[in-house]
């Protein structure tokens, strides 16, 4: 429906924070928080549509125009490298993309001497670029969850993963070594939609900007 604005949002805490933020600018989408298996919601009165998708898929839905807008972590954008407009840092969902290793290794390790190291991560593209810029060769193992397990069972020496409080790392005997990036959620926009629906999208962007 060309007169609708479609927004792709992932489940979880990002969804809750997004709904709260939209409410501040008069966009009512609290239905998204209901206990349902629905993936698409429509508000006919406000001409808004919402898609609930995996966080890693948000940039793809926006890039291909299935969604006009999306809300997603900067980590996902860095890894995906899609051709998108990124007008706003929404200032929520803060965490850090970190290099970590076992505590016993960190006590005697010298990161400046690293070379040919094996790293497990959900972010192979970001990780490879980070270490290439430092002139360090790495062997990357892509995992999709429980990254902290990799050093414990000998799959990798180190990991690159998102860290919020650091408690999960500590419980698994891992220490933070280097910060690759500080991460927050971003508003992203399909480039064609920004032109064809410029007035409505600009109004949303301006409204959000006043509340972050």
UniProtKB/Swiss-Prot annotation:
Pathway: Amino-acid biosynthesis; L-histidine biosynthesis; L-histidine from 5-phospho-alpha-D-ribose 1-diphosphate: step 1/9. It is an enzyme of class 2 (transferase). It is found in: Cytoplasm. GO terms for biological process: L-histidine biosynthetic process. Transmembrane segments: none annotated. CDD domains: PBP2_HisGs. It catalyses: 1-(5-phospho-beta-D-ribosyl)-ATP + diphosphate = 5-phospho-alpha-D-ribose 1-diphosphate + ATP. GO terms for molecular function: ATP binding; ATP phosphoribosyltransferase activity. Its EC number is 2.4.2.17. InterPro entries: ATP_PRibTrfase_cat (IPR013820), ATP_PRibTrfase_CS (IPR018198), ATP_PRibTrfase_HisG (IPR001348), ATP_PRibTrfase_HisG_short (IPR024893). GO terms for cellular component: cytoplasm. The keyword Nucleotide-binding applies. Lacks the C-terminal regulatory region which is replaced by HisZ. NCBIfam families: hisG. Belongs to the ATP phosphoribosyltransferase family. Short subfamily. Catalyzes the condensation of ATP and 5-phosphoribose 1-diphosphate to form N'-(5'-phosphoribosyl)-ATP (PR-ATP). Has a crucial role in the pathway because the rate of histidine biosynthesis seems to be controlled primarily by regulation of HisG enzymatic activity. Heteromultimer composed of HisG and HisZ subunits. This is ATP phosphoribosyltransferase. It comes from Citrifermentans bemidjiense (strain ATCC BAA-1014 / DSM 16622 / JCM 12645 / Bem) (Geobacter bemidjiensis).
């Amino acid at each position: 429906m060309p007169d609708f604005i479609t927004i792709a949002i992932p489940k979880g805490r990002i969804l809750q924070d997004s709904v709260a933020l939209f409410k501040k600018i008069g966009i009512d989408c609290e239905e998204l928080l209901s206990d349902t298996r629905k993936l698409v919601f429509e508000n006919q009165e406000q001409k808004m549509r919402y898609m609930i998708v995996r966080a890693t898929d948000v940039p793809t839905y926006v890039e291909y125009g299935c969604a006009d807008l999306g809300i997603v972590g900067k980590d996902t954008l860095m890894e995906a490298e899609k051709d998108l407009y990124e007008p706003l840092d929404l200032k929520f969902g803060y965490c850090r993309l970190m290099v970590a290793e076992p505590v016993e290794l960190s006590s005697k390790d010298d990161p400046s001497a690293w070379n040919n190291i094996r790293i497990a991560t959900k972010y192979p593209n970001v990780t490879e670029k980070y270490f290439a810029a430092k002139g360090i060769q790495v062997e990357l193992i892509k995992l999709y969850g429980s990254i902290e397990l990799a050093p414990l069972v000998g799959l990798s020496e180190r990991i690159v993963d998102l860290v919020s409080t650091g408690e999960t790392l500590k419980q698994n005997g891992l220490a933070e070594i280097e910060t690759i990036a500080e991460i927050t959620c971003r508003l992203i926009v399909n480039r064609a939609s920004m032109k064809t629906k410029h007035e409505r999208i600009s109004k949303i962007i301006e409204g959000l900007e006043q509340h972050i």
